[in-house]
Regions:
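Single conserved hydrophobic/aromatic residue that forms the stacking wall/gate
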Residues: 1-8, 12-13
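Active-site His/acidic residue clusters
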Residues: 32-35, 53-109, 113, 134-136, ...
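Metal-dependent active-site segment of extracytoplasmic phospho-/sulfohydrolases and closely related
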Residues: 102, 106-143, 152, 177-184
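Formylglycine-dependent
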Residues: 14-64
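Feature representing long, continuous alpha-helical segments
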Residues: 47, 51, 55, 98-101, ...
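Loop/turn elements at helix/coil->beta-strand transitions in domains of secreted/extracellular proteins
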Residues: 63, 67-74, 119-125, 157, ...
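Membrane-interface soluble catalytic domains
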Residues: 65, 159-258
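Structural recognition of the beta-strand scaffold that forms the well-ordered cores
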Residues: 73-75, 127, 152-153, 203
Length: 258
C-alpha cells in the first residue's frame, strides 16, 4: 500500500506530525523542489506538483509495480489558486479567475496523462475544494454561497458519467468512498454515504460563533454569539434550526468523550 501527500507549500512540514499519525508514509512539500521551482508565495506552482505525482506514477508503471502496490491513497493539495493569485499562466484578465483557470488546467492535464497509465483503470480521483471564499469577492461567513463547493469523482473505476444532486459535507466523503468499496465506515460517526438513497441528505458547516444546516427545502445559518438566525431560506423556513442546534450539541458531546 502507498499513502502519499503532496503539497507544493510548507503546509506538509507544519502538519507532518498529523499526517504521519494518520498513516502517510511519503510527504512531499516545497522543500522537495529545487529553489528555482519555488517561485510562488506558497512554494512550487501547481503544475510542478502534479508533474511530480505523475512522474511517481509513471515510475511505478515502468517498474511493473503499479499493480503490486495497489491499493494506494494519495492526496495532492493545490495552492496556486490562493492569493496573491500570481501564476505562470494568462488566459483571463481577472487575476483571481485566471489563477482558478490555471489550477483547473493543471488538473486537466494531469488527468489526460494519467489516463494513459495502467493504474487508471482501478483508480478513483476525488476533486474537492477545502473551502470557497475567494470568489465572488467579499463574500462573508454568513452566506450560504460561502460553503457551496463541488465534489467530482473521475477515474477508470467510475462505471459511467452521472450527476447526483444531493447535499452533503466534506466529512461525508469518507463514508461515501468506503461504501463504494464495500468497506466499513462506522468509525466515522458523523460521515454518511451520499450515494445511499436512504441516507439523510443535508450539509452542516460551522465557523467561529455560527453554524449552518442546509437541505433542499431549507437553508439556515444561525449566529450563536448574537443568538439570531441570519439566513432562513427555502420552502420550509425554520425547519433546520432545531436540527442544526441538535447536531452541534452532538458534536460537542462527541468531543467531550474523547
Amino acid at each position: 500500500e502507498i499513502a502519499q501527500c503532496l503539497v507544493g507549500s510548507e503546509m506538509c512540514i507544519r502538519d507532518s506530525s498529523y499526517l504521519m499519525s494518520s498513516g502517510f508514509e511519503d510527504i512531499v512539500s516545497d522543500q522537495d523542489f529545487p529553489v528555482t521551482e519555488r517561485l510562488s508565495k506558497w512554494g512550487a506552482h501547481d503544475h510542478l506538483v502534479f508533474n511530480r505525482l505523475l512522474e511517481d506514477l509513471k515510475t511505478e508503471a515502468a517498474e511493473g509495480t503499479a499493480e503490486e502496490k495497489t491499493p494506494h491513497f494519495r492526496v495532492l493539495q493545490t495552492s496556486s489558486s490562493h492569493e496573491p493569485f500570481e501564476v505562470p499562466f494568462r488566459r483571463l484578465e481577472n487575476d483571481r479567475l485566471n489563477a482558478f483557470a490555471y489550477t483547473d488546467s493543471c488538473a486537466g492535464d494531469f488527468v489526460r496523462q494519467f489516463r494513459e497509465l495502467p493504474q487508471w483503470k482501478n483508480t478513483v480521483i476525488v476533486f474537492v475544494p477545502d473551502h470557497l471564499g475567494a470568489y465572488p469577492e467579499h463574500i462573508d461567513n454568513l452566506s450560504v454561497e460561502r460553503y457551496r463547493i463541488p465534489l467530482l469523482m473521475v477515474g477508470g473505476a467510475i462505471r459511467e458519467p452521472r450527476r447526483i444532486d444531493v447535499y452533503g459535507s466534506q466529512h461525508d466523503i469518507a463514508a461515501t468512498l468506503l461504501a463504494q468499496l464495500a468497506l466499513p465506515h462506522e468509525e466515522f460517526v458523523f460521515s454518511k454515504d451520499m450515494l445511499n438513497p436512504a441516507s439523510p441528505h443535508f450539509a452542516f458547516f460551522t465557523v467561529p460563533d455560527a453554524f449552518g444546516m442546509v437541505t433542499a427545502d431549507n437553508q439556515v445559518i444561525f449566529n450563536c454569539q448574537a443568538g439570531a438566525v441570519v439566513v432562513d431560506e427555502g420552502t420550509v423556513k425554520g425547519k433546520n434550526l432545531p436540527l442544526g442546534k441538535a447536531y452541534l450539541q452532538k458534536l460537542y458531546d462527541d468531543i467531550a468523550k474523547r
